[in-house]
Amino acid sequence: MRGTVYKSTGSWYAVLGQDGQMHECRIKGKFRVQGIKSTNPVAVGDLVQFELEQSGDNPHGVIFDIVERRNYMIRKSVNLSKQTQIIAANIDQALLLITLNNPPTLTPFIDRFLVTAEAYDIPVILVFNKIDCYSAEERFEVDYLLSLYRTIGYTCLLVSALTGTGVDDLKQMMEGKTSLVSGHSGVGKSTLINT
């Protein structure tokens, strides 16, 4: 059966099968994707082939093939090895959530993200979140960053999950697209997704 990986925990994967059901799956034996030294060969967004197996009372799937990826986005493994981590595959766009404080997102982080996305031909939307929390000085800094990144061709959006500012525009930009939502812990990814 064919399906799409929706969640990866490292050894188990939630796969939405073509039957419309979510299946818990694992990979079969030593699984390698040609040309990529990765900490985990299966990524969220991958189209996979899997077989259902019965093991006691818990049926599960076994992934035996990954359909060729349209694209993917990686990051270096945090343990300083030469391996990479595929963070998403087959995506239409990436959204980078940015906050000036709680937590701060620094421009080198933004720039590294943009370079990585450009390397894999993935369009990026910069989403400046928590705009309801900024002082006049911080708002000036946001305006500077907006001007900077818009000038070099990036779509930028101001949002606040708390007040709803910009949320409808964000939903419209995501409509019908497979989007990677990224950013530091605490920038509001889950809050915005659940809004």
Where are these regions (language model features)?
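N-terminal accessory targeting/assembly segments
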Residues: M1-T107
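Residue-level signal for inorganic ion chemistry
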Residues: G45, A117, N129
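Conserved beta-strand/loop subsegment of P-loop NTPase cores
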Residues: N90-I98, D121-I131, R150-V159
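Short histidine/acidic/glycine/proline-rich micro-motifs that form metal-
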Residues: L100-P103, I131-S135
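Histidine-anchored nucleotide/phosphate-binding helix
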Residues: P108-P123
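Canonical P-loop GTPase G-domain recognition
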Residues: C133-V187
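Walker A/P-loop
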Residues: S185, S190-T191, T195
